[in-house]
């Protein structure tokens, strides 16, 4: 492929990532579909996907910058905890412990799950979880404040994000609601929780794929990053407003249709 084609492909993938990352519909599933449509090489895909996810993570960081400033202040200068700033560092660290531990243990095996067979099953199981969440959310007494047991439950469910196609948002938002958290709070916490994981995974992937990065790839990687960052910035606010109160049924239907499309067009 020419450099122009690579840059074009990277921009497309960045847009796909920016649109799909924040909804419970699996950005990894969509990226696999588009990398197949664009006929991209395997050695290009891994590092590019990592870079564009970093672009999406940066947009979350900027959107919640006040909370992350408090997070850093609580860690490094021991800022006094108030009702306004809450135990933000405690929430973020505790919520990410499960996926850090599990992720490091199975990191070398995750690549074997990046195929259409695995992604279809992940989409199906994630859809079932959304159905259970939608049915249960009117019956569960919601709590505005997040407690330690809920953080642990959400953190454990977040490990399902290691399965490409499941959707991190699907796992964490569902876990929050099922554990008794208001949907609006579940959505916000899901977004905030993702930032350290995205950046941590990016560093790990860059280290492990360092020799696949060449000077010729830099324009492609930068284009993908910028595309994902810009798209994410456009989408994130609208997504937050939509996801905080909406029904999960549209996402259940969408995931079901996506599973059928993958089966019919990419597995036959």
Swiss-Prot record:
Q: Supply the enzyme class, top level.
A: hydrolase
Per UniProt, subcellular location reads as: Cell membrane
> Do you know which InterPro entries this protein is assigned to?
UppP (IPR003824)
Any one Gene Ontology molecular-function term assigned to this protein's record:
undecaprenyl-diphosphatase activity
Q: Which UniProt keywords apply?
A: Antibiotic resistance, Cell membrane, Cell shape, Cell wall biogenesis/degradation, Hydrolase, Membrane, Peptidoglycan synthesis, Transmembrane, Transmembrane helix
* S-S bonds: none
Enzyme Commission number, as recorded: 3.6.1.27
**Reaction catalyzed:** di-trans,octa-cis-undecaprenyl diphosphate + H2O = di-trans,octa-cis-undecaprenyl phosphate + phosphate + H(+)
User: How is this protein situated with respect to the membrane?
Assistant: Multi-pass membrane protein
A Gene Ontology biological process annotation? response to antibiotic
Q: Name one GO cellular component term.
A: plasma membrane
Kindly report the protein's main subcellular placement as a broad class: membrane
Membrane-spanning parts = 7-27, 87-107, 116-136, 146-166, 187-207, 210-230, 247-267
Question: Its family?
Answer: Belongs to the UppP family.
In the UniProt entry for this protein, what further remark is given in the free-text comments? Answer: Bacitracin is thought to be involved in the inhibition of peptidoglycan synthesis by sequestering undecaprenyl diphosphate, thereby reducing the pool of lipid carrier available.
User: What HAMAP family does the entry give?
Assistant: Undec_diphosphatase
Q: Which PANTHER family match?
A: UNDECAPRENYL-DIPHOSPHATASE (PTHR30622:SF3)
The free-text function statement in the UniProt record for this protein reads: Catalyzes the dephosphorylation of undecaprenyl diphosphate (UPP). Confers resistance to bacitracin.
Name this polypeptide is given: Undecaprenyl-diphosphatase
Q: Which organism is it from?
A: Buchnera aphidicola subsp. Baizongia pistaciae (strain Bp)
């Amino acid at each position: 492929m020419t450099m122009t084609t690579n840059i074009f492909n990277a921009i497309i993938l960045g847009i796909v990532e920016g649109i799909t990352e924040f909804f419970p519909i699996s950005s990894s599933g969509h990226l696999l579909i588009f990398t197949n449509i664009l006929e991209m090489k395997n050695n290009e895909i891994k590092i590019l996907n990592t870079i564009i996810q970093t672009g999406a993570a940066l947009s979350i960081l900027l959107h919640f910058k006040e909370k992350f400033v408090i997070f850093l202040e609580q860690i490094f200068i021991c800022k006094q905890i108030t009702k306004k700033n809450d135990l933000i560092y405690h929430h973020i660290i505790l919520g990410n412990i499960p996926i850090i531990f599990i992720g490091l243990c199975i990191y070398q095996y995750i690549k074997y799950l990046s195929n259409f067979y695995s992604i279809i099953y992940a989409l199906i199981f994630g859809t079932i979880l959304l159905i259970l969440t939608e049915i249960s959310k009117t019956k569960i007494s919601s709590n505005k404040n997040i407690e330690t047991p809920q953080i642990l439950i959400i953190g454990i469910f977040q490990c399902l994000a290691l399965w490409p196609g499941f959707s991190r948002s699907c796992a964490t938002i569902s876990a929050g609601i099922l554990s008794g958290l208001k949907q609006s709070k579940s959505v916000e916490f899901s977004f905030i929780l993702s930032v350290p994981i995205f950046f941590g995974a990016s560093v790990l992937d860059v280290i492990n794929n360092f020799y696949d990065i060449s000077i010729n790839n830099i324009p492609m990687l930068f284009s993908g990053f910028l595309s994902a960052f810009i798209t994410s910035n456009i989408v994130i606010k609208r997504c937050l407003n939509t996801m905080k109160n909406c029904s999960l049924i549209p996402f259940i239907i969408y995931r079901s249709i996506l599973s059928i499309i993958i089966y019919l067009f990419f597995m036959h």
